[in-house]
Swiss-Prot record:
This is Ribosome maturation factor RimM. It comes from the Bacteria. Disulfide bonds: none annotated. Coiled coil: none annotated. Belongs to the RimM family. GO terms for cellular component: cytoplasm; ribosome. The PRC barrel domain binds ribosomal protein uS19. Residues 103-182 form the PRC barrel domain. Gene3D superfamilies: PRC-barrel domain, RimM. Pfam families: PRC, RimM.
Length: 182
């Protein structure tokens, strides 16, 4: 695979989308965005593609809406054959390009690995994933091996003030008002 982008050394990247099939003969690709607003993927630049274990930097030359989706053309990718090599590759960005959030806002990735503890001090486990349900986000918490309630995993709604009492970034801890039996 020819690497037309610029190789980078930093390994911390966030996947924000994926390339689909080629579009046309001039190097365009379909883009599937994982961002809340699909078109927001184009606000983050440059993009990084993992090629042979290394992050390679690409800049978006142009993009447009097409039917119900989006297509993009990367700089230096001018023929269908080059674009075809990118099919199904994930699109990642450097976390530094994300906007700063206020003290009470969080990116999901910040919550992963945090310990979840009840207001009474019971350790429920560690956040391993988040789910988007439409009405509210949900913490997926992997329970401790010694969980007295026999739980392997808990789903805890991320409802601030009702369930989520405090998120302490520094201590990597989330305090919740939650019954360990659930």
């Amino acid at each position: 695979m020819s690497m037309k982008g610029k190789e980078t050394m930093s390994n911390e990247k966030i996947v924000v989308g994926k390339f689909g099939a080629t579009y046309g003969i001039r190097g365009w690709l379909k883009v599937f965005s994982y961002t809340d607003n699909a078109e927001s993927i184009f606000d983050y630049s440059p993009w990084y593609i993992n090629q042979k274990g290394k992050w390679v930097e690409y800049k978006v030359e142009s993009w447009k809406r097409h039917n119900k989706g989006m297509v993009a053309k990367l700089e230096g990718m001018d023929v269908r054959e080059d674009a075809h090599l990118m099919t199904n590759f994930e699109i990642a960005i450097d976390p530094a390009v994300l906007p700063e959030l206020s003290e009470d806002e969080f990116y999901w990735r910040e919550l992963f690995g945090m310990h979840v503890v009840t207001t009474k001090g019971y350790d429920l486990g560690v956040v391993t994933d988040m789910l988007e349900t439409g009405s509210n986000d949900v913490l997926v918490v992997k329970a401790n091996l010694k969980d007295a309630f026999g739980q392997k995993e808990r789903l805890i709604p991320f409802l601030e003030e009702q369930v989520i009492i405090k998120v302490d970034r520094e201590a990597q801890r989330i305090e919740v008002d939650w019954d360990p039996g659930f």
